[in-house]
Structures are given as structure tokens and as C-alpha cells.
Design a protein with these regions (language model features):
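Interfacial segments of multi-pass membrane proteins
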Residues: 294-301, 355-370
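Hydrophobic membrane-spanning alpha-helices of multi-pass integral membrane proteins
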Residues: 335-344, 375-381, 401-421, 471-486, ...
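Transmembrane helix-loop-helix hairpins at membrane boundaries of multipass inner-membrane proteins
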Residues: 1-4, 8, 12-99, 103-107, ...
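Alpha-helical multi-pass transmembrane bundles of energy-transducing inner-membrane proteins
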Residues: 22-27, 107-194, 205-208, 273-335, ...
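Predominantly late transmembrane helices and immediately cytosolic-facing juxtamembrane segments
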Residues: 213, 310-334, 364-411, 439-466
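Short helix-boundary/re-entrant hairpin motifs in multi-pass inner-membrane proteins
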Residues: 54, 61, 90, 197-257, ...
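Short aromatic-rich membrane-water interface segments that cap or initiate transmembrane helices
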Residues: 62-78, 191-196, 362-370
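Aromatic-capped, Gly/Pro-kinked transmembrane alpha-helices
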Residues: 426-433, 453-518
Length: 518
């Protein structure tokens, strides 16, 4: 069934491209139908795990000793199901957006989701590195295609460069663990401490926690539709890796670094998420805040359960807040519920996190971290209220079917989040309810404080927060990178034109000699 789901996503993208000359309504209907089928297939996979799909080892075996390996288990299923839910919600709400997506963009929806699901299913570091690299390459091509200014191209290249560093660290960690006598599986404990550090650093870099960076470039055409996938899927894939690492157990030596990354990201992400009024521009800070919460709940003794819940919350509540536009008073319900989930409402992923923090507090474990995390949860919920208080905008269409599918698109992630929360943990504990109440009190106090705050003071705080921005550093790094690109371009000119044929024969000659020597 995982192969059936992946095949359906591939067929959907191809079908949309074939129908590119058809009416927009037809393309949307086909996209919605395929997304619904993928969502149902993802739901049925709950009855199919655990399952492992193994491909043959690449040749030569002395160079590629790890096969491509996919694993369907509790962790991969819930991330997979959340991703298909985000895809379905994004397509359902697309009918009510004034911007019309082209057939190429619609096909990209399905191809990109398929790559993200492959990364979730990856059971070893080789498979994960390949899927990460494919996602990064596909994203870079799309960003460069949409970039309208040189600055946009510059930001896209640096974002891809940061992600590529994560891929290289992942491969380096796999190599060190292999040299120490271990394997490349992410379901068994690591042998090399250095390998663990590098793999964790790869995940933290792609999450934007170490060093701090603020996600993908913000292009105007990517506000709510495709931008939701590009903002949420890469960090969710990294959180899935982090979940695996907590499942197999982490050395004590890694805890101080993870704690530093979690607290720093929670402070910066939480404050920026509150102060930024536009929910679309503030999405990177939402991702940073939830990712930091995942790290902190994992360190509090909760292990993989809390990280898994945070990853699902990132996908589902992030989709609701990213896709929501207020057209009627009824549309405000779903951002409000999302805010309650973020502060730990029972029977939700946030409630699971609240319960785990409550248990840690009762047992006297990491009290300071627990208090910081509860305040961070309050900040996440408070920032989500920006969407709740947005001004109403008129419907772009008068069709009742469009309004119905839009409402369903906002409701589905929230309802799935509640269902997943009940599936994870049926009964909320008293300590979890206390944490939820505490986060609600902190959030209420913060709301009253911000309401009484003069506008000039809020703008001053916003200006101070804007100084924590990595873009000036990126601009400084752009100059040596551009010089390197010129060198590469001049070297590449040797291979152009009539000289290309000669160089091709030289390369073939070296290959023949190498094979003969082997």
C-alpha cells in the first residue's frame, strides 16, 4: 500500500500535466479527486504497519553497502497521514483563492508530496539523504523559476545551500558510524558519538535551530497555496528524523547542545511569531517555535512520543493557520481551535505535549525547561490569534460549492489533529490539564498586555526583533560565492563548443583505464 500511495501521487501529477489545456475547473476537480484518494489510502495504511520494503544493494557493493530501505511504522504512518491531509486541505481551499495555479504548479503539488513521503518512509541514512537531495533540488528549481528579482535568486540559492549542508552532514554521520562498526539504519542505536552529533546537526540546521535561519524565501506567489507545502514539509521531514533519533536513544553528551538549540529557538521563534501580524510572513517563526518545542519535550524524558506529536501539530495546525482567510465569521472557528491545540487542549497533539510536560513537572524533571516550554506554548497560541482577528475579505466567487470545499479544507486538518490526538493518548491526565490551564493563563495575560500596549511601543519591539535576522550574513557570504561561480563558469567554458567532444573522449578514456586497472 505505501507503493500504491506513491504511485497514485505520481499518476496524479502526470494526469494534471496531461490535462493542462483543459479548463481550470476540470484541473481542480481532478486534483481534488486524486488528493482525496491519496488521503484515504494514507488512512488505510494504519492497518498495514509494521512493514519494510527493501530494494537491492547498489553496485559495486564495496562502495554502496546500504540498500534503499523504506519502513512503515507508527512514526512514519502518522507523518504520512498528516502530509496527505495537508495536501487535501490545500487543494480544497485553492478553489477560493483568487490566484489560479498553473498545471505545472498543480503537478508539483503531488510530486513534492510524494518525495516528502518517501523521506518519511526512509529507514536508513542513504535513502534519507537521497530523498532530501531530491526535495532540495526540486525546490531550488521551482524557486529560481518564480524569482522575479536578483535578491530572490540569491535567497533561494542560500536556502538551498543551507539544506545541502544538512545532506552532507547526514552522509558524513553515516560514514563515521559505518567506520565505527555500525550501520546506516535510523532504527538502531548509533555506535559513533561523532556520527550522532553530525546527524542531529543536520536535522537542526534544516529546522533552522542551529544556526538560526528563517526558512525558505518569501515569494509573493507562494503565500497560501504551494507556500504551505514548501514551508511545512521540509521541517516535518527533519522532525521525523529527530523522532527516530529519540526513539533509538541519544547520548548524554548531545543533551546540552539540543537544550541550547531548543531554548534559543523557542525564545526567538515565539517572540517573532507574536510580534509579526501577518500570518504568512511569520510562518518561519511558527516553524521555529514548534520545532524548538519538539526538541524540549523530547529532552524532558518524553522521548519520541512528544517529538512525534509536535511534528504532527506543525503540519496540521500550520496548514490551518497558513490556509485560513476570513470570509465569514464561521471561518474564525478553525484558527481559534488551532490556537487552543497549540496551548495544549486535551485530545489533541498539543494535549499530548502538555501531558508529557505535566508528568515531567510532577516528577521534578527539568523544571526550568518545563516552565520555558509552557510559556512558549502560550506564545504559539497567542500568535495564532492574529489569524482569528484578521479582517474579513469578500469571497472571490459566489459559488456555493467553492465555499463548501473551502470550509472543509480548513476543518479537515483540525479534525484529523483531534483524531490523531485521541489515537495517541485517549485520556488526558490531571497534570496535562494543569499545563493547558497554565498556558491559557500565560496566553491570556500576554493578550491583555499586548492590547494595552501603545502602537509605538509595539513597533519599537518589532524593530528590535527584526535585528535578529541572518539575511545580512547571507548577503556578506554572497560575494565569495559569486566569485566562485565566476571561476566555475570560466572553467566550464572549456567544455563548451567543439572542445566538448574532445573532453568527452578524455573522460571515457579515464573510465576505461580505471576499469581495466580494477
Amino acid at each position: 500500500l505505501p507503493i500504491l500511495l506513491l504511485s497514485t501521487l505520481l499518476i496524479a501529477g502526470i494526469a494534471i500535466w496531461i490535462l493542462r489545456n483543459q479548463a481550470v475547473r476540470t484541473q481542480w476537480a481532478v486534483s481534488a479527486a486524486f488528493a482525496a484518494v491519496c488521503w484515504l489510502l494514507g488512512m488505510t495504511l494504519i492497518f498495514r504497519y509494521p512493514a519494510i520494503l527493501r530494494f537491492s544493494v547498489w553496485q559495486p557493493e564495496n562502495l554502496f553497502q546500504s540498500p534503499l530501505l523504506l519502513s512503515l511504522d507508527r512514526t512514519s504512518w502518522v507523518y504520512l497521514y498528516a502530509m496527505t491531509t495537508v495536501l487535501l486541505a490545500m487543494i480544497f481551499t485553492a478553489a477560493a483563492r483568487p490566484a489560479i495555479a498553473s498545471a505545472g504548479v498543480r503537478a508539483f503539488w503531488f510530486f513534492y508530496t510524494g518525495l516528502a513521503i518517501l523521506a518519511i518512509l526512509a529507514a536508513n541514512l542513504l535513502t534519507l539523504a537521497i530523498t532530501w537531495a531530491l526535495m532540495d533540488f526540486m525546490t531550488l528549481v521551482f524557486y529560481v523559476r518564480l524569482a522575479g528579482r536578483p535578491l530572490d535568486v540569491q535567497r533561494a540559492l542560500f536556502r538551498s545551500g543551507v539544506d545541502m549542508v544538512g545532506v552532507l552532514l547526514l552522509l558524513a554521520g553515516a560514514s563515521l558510524n559505518h567506520l565505527a562498526g555500525g550501520d546506516t539504519l535510523i532504527t538502531t542505536p548509533f555506535v559513533s558519538l561523532s556520527g550522532v552529533f553530525l546527524v542531529l546537526l543536520a536535522a537542526l540546521i534544516r529546522l533552522g535551530l542551529m544556526p538560526l535561519h528563517f526558512g525558505a524565501p518569501g515569494f509573493e506567489p507562494l503565500r497560501r497555496g504551494l507556500g504551505t507545502l514548501l514551508r511545512l514539509f521540509p521541517p516535518a521531514v527533519s522532525l521525523a528524523l529527530l523522532t527516530r533519533m529519540f526513539e533509538i536513544g541519544l547520548p548524554e553528551a548531545t543533551r546540552p547542545w539540543l537544550l541550547l538549540a531548543g531554548i534559543t529557538g523557542m525564545i526567538v521563534g515565539g517572540i517573532r511569531w507574536i510580534l509579526e501580524a501577518d500570518a504568512i510572513r511569520s510562518r518561519p517563526f511558527f516553524v521555529m517555535g514548534v520545532s524548538s518545542l519538539a526538541v524540549l519535550v523530547g529532552l524532558n524524558g518524553a522521548g519520541a512520543e512528544g517529538v512525534r506529536a509536535a511534528g504532527v501539530m506543525l503540519l496540521l495546525m500550520g496548514a490551518t493557520l497558513s490556509l485560513a482567510e476570513i470570509h465569514t465569521p464561521a471561518n474564525r472557528i478553525w484558527p481559534l481551535i488551532a490556537a487552543l491545540v497549540l496551548i495544549g487542549a486535551p485530545w489533541t497533539p498539543g494535549g499530548i505535549i502538555a501531558g508529557l510536560f505535566g508528568e515531567a513537572f510532577v516528577e521534578g524533571r527539568a523544571l526550568v525547561t518545563t516552565v520555558i516550554s509552557v510559556i512558549g506554548m502560550a506564545a504559539l497560541g497567542l500568535g495564532a490569534l492574529h489569524v482569528f482577528f484578521e479582517e474579513e475579505t469578500p469571497w472571490p466567487t459566489a459559488e456555493s460549492l467553492t465555499r463548501l470545499t473551502y470550509g472543509l479544507g480548513l476543518a479537515i486538518p483540525v479534525l484529523v489533529g483531534i483524531g490523531v490526538g485521541i489515537w495517541f493518548r485517549t485520556l488526558p491526565g490531571l497534570s496535562g490539564l494543569i499545563v493547558f490551564g497554565s498556558a491559557a493563563l500565560f496566553g491570556g495575560a500576554g493578550f491583555l498586555l499586548l492590547r494595552r500596549l501603545p502602537a509605538t511601543q509595539a513597533q519599537r519591539w518589532q524593530a528590535i526583533a527584526d535585528r535578529v535576522d541572518p539575511q545580512p550574513v547571507y548577503r556578506l557570504l554572497w560575494y565569495p560565492l559569486r566569485s566562485l561561480a565566476r571561476i566555475v563558469r570560466s572553467v566550464g567554458a572549456v567544455f563548451e563548443g567543439e572542445g566538448a567532444l574532445i573532453w568527452m573522449f578524455v573522460v571515457l578514456l579515464f573510465v576505461v583505464l580505471a576499469l581495466g586497472a580494477g
